[in-house]
Amino acid sequence: MGVWWEMITGQSTWWYTNDLSSVRINETNYDELEPNDSHAANNKKVMRYIDFAAQHGFDALLVEGWNIGWEDWFNKKKDYVFDFLTPYPDFDIEKLNNYAKEKGISLMMHHETSGAIRNYERHMDEAYSLMNKHGYKSVKSGYVGRIIPAGERHYGQYMVDHYICLLYTSDAADDN
């Protein structure tokens, strides 16, 4: 079960604000921007989905769009689009994980790479540490878009090596 159903059906957005045409990770201050009121991965909606999941026998909930960068993530060929660490101002990662745990639900982490593999690998250790800190037990890694660097393919050797790196990194993070 996932919050993303609202997004793919056009009821809500992955992004927090409509005020940006370009995001600069570690420079864009989301606290100074006006929320668009259609961002799906917010505390209120996620808690509602957690309640639904608990009531209907689900054990986990996937939450896409929780982290900064979604305003210009797709088809821009940006190497540095997400940091996999910084939630939007309306997503309290600790509060939501505690709430989910009280209801017997696990939140599933989402790491959309937008095809920027070097960027994901650059942040992987910290991203998995954040997951461990907050009790996440699983992650869905996304690879929407063309793979960066240019010329690489989703199922070429470059990506096979990346997937192997993912396995080793996640296993090592799980041991900590």
Go through each PLM region and give its residues.
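Short, hinge-like loop/turn segments at secondary-structure boundaries
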Residues: 79-80, 126-127, 157-158
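Generic non-transmembrane alpha-helix signal with a bias for helix starts/N-cap capping motifs
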Residues: 46, 93, 124, 163-164
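Conserved structural scaffold segments of CAZyme catalytic domains across common CAZy folds
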Residues: 1-102, 111
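Single conserved hydrophobic/aromatic residue that forms the stacking wall/gate
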Residues: 168-176
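Outer-membrane beta-barrel translocator/channel fold
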Residues: 149-151, 155
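Soluble non-cytosolic domains of exported or imported proteins
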Residues: 40-44, 87, 118, 122, ...
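Aromatic/hydrophobic pocket-lining residues that form π-stacking "cages" and hydrophobic walls in ligand
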Residues: 49, 96, 127, 166-169
